[in-house]
């Protein structure tokens, strides 16, 4: 009986440790970044229009699609920056004062996809994440929100948005990352920050 409980404990602890192993499976950014860099002229134009760092846009392209504009995920995310028509796409349309949502063919167009992706990053930074003071913390918060939603991130701090922002402002970038590792319900969240940094370092 003791042996059985020992085995259960070992399995449980192994599961806990693997939950936060955001470095597995390994990810080599070299090829995805190289392919994403071919879209840099468009990323620079979109970044200038929306006040978004084109290197951040390029890193997200590398992570999301590896630079392939025709990719459609199982969840329905489309194109270089893997935008979902009914969520991020609809948010951008609303921000532009347009009705409806973008079509799949529109999101497969590199210029339209990157423009809308940059717009969505701006919406996150100037909307639910507005008030975060540290630029590196903001960058981490933006990409986690891009991948998993701003609400999911803010709720790991507080159910009140302003209280959550205040708590975030008490952290530096490393402390914010550790919080995401420990508190965010999506294993993808810390992994996204890790991949972002690897992509930026590879540029």
Curated annotation (Swiss-Prot):
E.C. designation(s): 4.2.2.n2
One example GO MF annotation: lytic endotransglycosylase activity
Lipid moiety-binding region (S-diacylglycerol cysteine): 16
Domain of life: Bacteria
GO BP term (any one): cell wall organization
Leading EC class: lyase
Reaction(s) catalysed by this chain's protein: Endolytic cleavage of the (1->4)-beta-glycosidic linkage between N-acetylmuramic acid (MurNAc) and N-acetylglucosamine (GlcNAc) residues in peptidoglycan with concomitant formation of a 1,6-anhydrobond in the MurNAc residue
GO CC entries: cell outer membrane
Chief location of this protein within or outside the cell: membrane
Signal peptide range: 1-15
SUPFAM superfamilies tied to this protein: Lysozyme-like (SSF53955)
A Pfam family per the record: SLT
N-palmitoyl cysteine: lipidated positions: 16
Membrane topology summary: Lipid-anchor
UniProt entry keywords in alphabetical sequence: Cell outer membrane, Cell wall biogenesis/degradation, Lipoprotein, Lyase, Membrane, Palmitate, Signal
Cross-referenced Gene3D superfamilies: 1.10.530.10
UniProt entry tagged with the keyword Membrane: yes
Similarity section: Belongs to the transglycosylase Slt family.
Protein's job: Murein-degrading enzyme. May play a role in recycling of muropeptides during cell elongation and/or cell division. Preferentially cleaves at a distance of more than two disaccharide units from the ends of the glycan chain.
Designated name of the protein: Endo-type membrane-bound lytic murein transglycosylase A
Organism: Klebsiella pneumoniae (strain 342)
């Amino acid at each position: 009986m003791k042996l059985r409980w020992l085995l259960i404990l070992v399995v449980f602890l192994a599961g806990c440790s693997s939950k936060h192993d955001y470095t597995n499976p390994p990810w080599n950014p070299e090829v995805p970044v190289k392919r994403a860099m071919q879209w840099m002229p468009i990323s620079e134009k979109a970044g200038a229009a929306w006040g978004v760092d084109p290197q951040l846009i390029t890193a997200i392209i590398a992570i999301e699609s590896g630079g392939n504009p025709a990719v459609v995920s199982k969840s329905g995310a489309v194109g270089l920056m893997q935008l979902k028509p009914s969520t991020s796409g609809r948010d951008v349309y609303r921000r532009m004062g347009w009705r409806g949502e973008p079509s799949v063919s529109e999101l497969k167009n590199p210029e339209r996809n990157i423009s809308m992706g940059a717009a969505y990053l701006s919406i996150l930074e100037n909307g639910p994440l507005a008030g975060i003071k540290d630029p590196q913390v903001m960058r981490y918060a933006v990409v986690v929100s891009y991948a998993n939603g701003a609400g999911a991130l803010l709720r790991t701090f507080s159910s009140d948005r302003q209280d959550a922002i205040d708590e975030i402002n008490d952290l530096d970038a490393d402390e914010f990352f550790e919080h995401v590792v420990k508190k965010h319900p999506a294993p993808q969240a810390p992994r996204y920050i890790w991949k972002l940094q690897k992509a930026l370092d590879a540029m």
